[in-house]
Amino acid sequence: MTELARHESGFLLRTEEGELRSRSVLLATGVHNRRPNMSEAMHDDALSRGLLRYCPICDGYEVTDTNVAVIGSGNHGLQEALFLRGFTERVTLVAPDGVHALSEEDFSLAEDAAISLIDGPIAAITIEGDQLCLATPSGRLAFTSVYPALGSVIRSELGRSVGADLSDKGCILVDAHQRTSYQGLYAAGDVVIGLDQISHAMGEGGVAATTIRNDLANIKPLYRGRP
């Protein structure tokens, strides 16, 4: 879908194949993780081999007692490194572009957790054997797995285009039944505020589907065999 617009009976959806009309729309457009500077082919290879990972909540246990790096800085990057510290003693936080942007409190937290801090910029990322290597001003560093903590782009443009309320970070705001602020529009998954996990998104999708069915039935009874 390339465009979502309001219509007198609901919504007008434009796609590459043409236009559709719908009384209700469920947006499950998710987010796009910001990637480290590496070719798509290398990125996909590293991802398939577990050298590059994006969700420590999902698979942090798989890097137990290995040598792990987090690419990121600021409190966001540090929090991911601290989370991974629960799985392994060897965690390094590498700033992608320059010196670390950490507060005194952040530096203290990193020191207390024995997290190594490496300033960037990262000049190159390569795969060498079963390790992902980062070229930094401190030298070439090799890791069993690397987690980018570079943030994400929330794909909420379609919701914004019809006037749905968004959070300060751009997530679509919904009620307990996945309704947005615009009647007939629903949202589920990573595009709304919550835990970015498949199982959580599936649950929200189930809630949204039930809500949509019931809301449509309140407009007009849904009886089989009747137009």
Predicted regions and their residues:
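Short glycine-/acidic-enriched loop or helix-start segments at secondary-structure transitions
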Residues: 36-38, 64, 79-81, 103, ...
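Glycine-rich Rossmann-fold phosphate-binding loop(s) that bind the pyrophosphate
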Residues: 72-74
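FAD-binding core/adjacent interface of flavoenzyme oxidoreductases
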Residues: 1-66, 136, 145, 172-176, ...
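A Rossmann-like FAD-binding core segment of flavoenzymes
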Residues: 1-8, 12-14, 19-22, 86-171, ...
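Residues that mark the start of a beta-strand
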Residues: 66-67, 90
